[in-house]
């Protein structure tokens, strides 16, 4: 009797990290948030001509930031790899809330930035003139700017908390969560 035994089929292994596009978008947003926040904090130390140049750079990077954030949200809703939460049951709601805030606040921040520019008008690098919207004014622009600035501080605070949570997973829990945002080797 000839009995043939085959090896059991390998079980499908769930991916342990996000896809490359998601990872690139994540780290691009991290760099843009850090650069934009730090630049905005230092911008008022510049002399007048340099000050206008720095604002033009901030506005340009803000437009790039808005585009990347919008693409990131669309990517995550459609093609991006979904991984299950690694947190215990009690932390799942907090994790979901943090991630929702980290998606929505950058969108709100970008819209506020656009509102600032449209409320007062701007000459971008002295080349492109963005006109003031009807009903716009410098006082309105300043009010929107105040909200934009506070929203940026909230984003940096939450992003710092997010980073600290990732480090907690890495060094205290040692559960491999931080590896999810590293490129596969």
What are the roles of these predicted feature ranges?
Residues 1-185:
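Membrane-embedded alpha-helical bundles that constitute the cytochrome b-like, heme-associated redox core
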